[in-house]
């Protein structure tokens, strides 16, 4: 949908989105920045699906919108598409994908935060070796999935397990 063809958001819808966002940042997994682990997540990368502190949000913005699309939790109006993405993901699932091959709970030292973020998202240094799943609930398991022969680039990974 093009920008020009979007209908204006109603006040009720904007208020509902704001309430949902405030509730999401209160969840234990979203209270800390997905990247540096600091408190006060007032920003989010809606396409990655993670909540961020102000410092890390600036680094995300500097990577460009082809990597990360940042919005304020408090100041911006969120579209239904953006809300759907941030609600499906959250920090736990986002880090299950982007930090799959990194020690759990890793927090980079202050002087290395920018290089850590760029390695994490631009270079995909610790990411799963599978495409980003359409349904992030597949990441709710504790073990990273290896790519399968049926995984196509750009498509969600398929399971080889029997039902």
State what each model feature region is.
Residues 47-53, 84:
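Short beta-strand-alpha-helix junction that forms the catalytic/metal-binding core
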Residues 51-66:
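Cys/His-coordinated zinc-finger cores
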Residues 33-36, 53:
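Short cysteine-rich clusters marking metal-coordination/redox-active sites
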